[in-house]
Amino acid sequence: MIASIVFFIVLVDGVATGSPNALVTDFDCRPGMKHCGVCQQLISGSTGANALCSYKGVGDFIVNNFSMGPVDWLWPSTAPSYAVVSESWGCVDDGAAFCDTTGNFRDHRGRVAREGRDGLGTVLIRPAGNGGPIDDCGADGFTQAIGTVVTTVTDYTRSERCAAVLVTVPPPNETVWYDGKCGFIPSSSSAAPPILGNMLLALIRAHPTLTLRMIQRILVRAAKPVTVTGWRGRGWWLNRVTDRWTHRNFGFGEVSPSRLEIEARRELSTSRAPVAWSTLDTCDLSEVEWVRVRLGIAPAVFRGGVTVEISSPSGTIIEILGKRPLDFSRDEFEGEFVTPFWGEPGRGKWTVSCTGGVILTTEGTCHGIR
């Protein structure tokens, strides 16, 4: 058995300090709040009374929780070295809200992703959302960051379309210990981040030198399409450039826990060029990993009728914002959108197109290997 360092956490005036293995954030993590409590149990694994239930996550990990306040909440200026932060909150899933995140909040979360865990990078995991076909997590700015791993439950019918989704996790048809008994894990996208977080905590414990970028690459290679999503025709397509299957709702597919260890060893034995970035109109990368665009848009009629697509020089077309029929706002808006283009060459013409509106401002970057 691999030994691990035990970390402790102290909350001082509502600010998290110290260095635990993981952190769960939710709108309300007071004692007795089931949503946050179940997420904390899922990421901590099968320990104590939880071992009596059918969920068998790897244990045991020290997990703290943090109640989110207003959107101007900031990470401490000296970011704690969390290995994983599981975030099961976000934009309201009503198909009408549009959340753009700017300023200090985005900057501090970005710094944690880059500098956490002594510079290796903290893994921030977010759910795609529960809005189903009436919503699109492209409108949830909290998911739109290159350092964030967005996930959902495979074949979850209320999962929002989202070009930012990297991978999915198996449906949680298991029970977890809560409120003095074993109860079924709620089937929602909120359950996906802590389930994936538990897998990644085990991976990091076995391979503590893995960086955030390495973990993202491992996840892509450890994922595969699954039959339950109808991968032989229902939305899955094969990228002939990268030879990878992808899906608008499910990213690169469902993570196989057994493949994580195999791909981790492969990644650690591979000499890889450092990450590079370029503006999208002059992208000179040999392998693009992520593309980020920030757009200002004026709707022709309603904001919910606006769709945005990005096409690569290789001809891959990805919808980064879909129709949201309950969003009747007529106001101009700004949004930031990210999507993975794992392994495609960046040289050539990138095109961002919009229907149902007019693009007023455009700024984009590509990130990957030069």
From Swiss-Prot:
Give the GO cellular component terms, alphabetically: membrane
Indicate the enzyme's highest-level EC class: hydrolase
Biological processes per GO annotation:
protein processing
Q: Which Gene3D superfamilies match?
A: Galactose-binding domain-like, Peptidase S8/S53 domain
- Domain Peptidase S8: from-to ranges: 18-261
Every P/Homo B domain range: 240-370
What UniProt keywords apply to this chain's record, in alphabetical order? Hydrolase, Protease, Serine protease, Signal
Q: Which residues form the active site?
A: D13, H35, S190
Q: Which InterPro entries match?
A: Galactose-bd-like_sf, P_dom, Peptidase_S8/S53_dom_sf
The positions making up the signal sequence are 1-17
PROSITE patterns, sorted: P_HOMO_B, SUBTILASE
Instruction: Show the GO MF annotations.
Output: serine-type endopeptidase activity
SUPFAM superfamilies for the chain:
Galactose-binding domain-like, Subtilisin-like
- Sequence similarity: Belongs to the peptidase S8 family.
Q: What is this protein called?
A: Subtilisin-like protease
- What organism is the protein native to? Ictalurid herpesvirus 1 (strain Auburn) (IcHV-1)
List the top taxonomic levels of the source: Viruses, Duplodnaviria, Heunggongvirae, Peploviricota, Herviviricetes
